[in-house]
Amino acid sequence: IIQMPEDLIIFQEIVYKTRPDLIIETGVARGGSIIFWASIQKLCGITGKVLGVDIDIRQHARNTITDSNFKDEIYLIEGSSVEEQIINQVKNYVSQHKKIMVVLDSNHTHEHVLSELEIYSKFVTKDCFMLVLDTVIDDLNIDPDRSWGPGSSPKSAVKEFMIKNSAEFTREQSYEDRALLSVAPYGYWRKI
């Protein structure tokens, strides 16, 4: 799992309190987070699924997921999270669920995250969360070879998105404050 331990504790609490029967995560990477979400649902007694969307799901990630005890709770879609064909597949899958949480953790550029916010925020159900991860990129300048960084990051995208959508979501800063070290400052949003 490529996350901060403090965030993982908060994620568990959010799943326990909101009880989503579907967690959508954009960005699969090595598959650890997808398995984490499925394991937390099961631990909380939630009969649910985790939908992972990634432009390039590597074989080692697929193997990790299919070798896990949670393979039956996980469904993967390969393709760009903002492509119409992929969005239609997500819409079809979402229609089977009532309580939906979204975790955005794929391409971290401002434009991509803003597109994801505009698309995936519509899937989040009342009182469930939209987590925008790696907003901390905006506060750091440690990888200048990337297409993202200060000013073009998940945080800059969230700030722009919330100008027009603040009536739909409320920032749950108490989680950020409790996490202390978080990859998602300004990234915990609950649908109201």
Residue map of PLM features:
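S-adenosylmethionine/decaboxylated-SAM
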Residues: 2-192
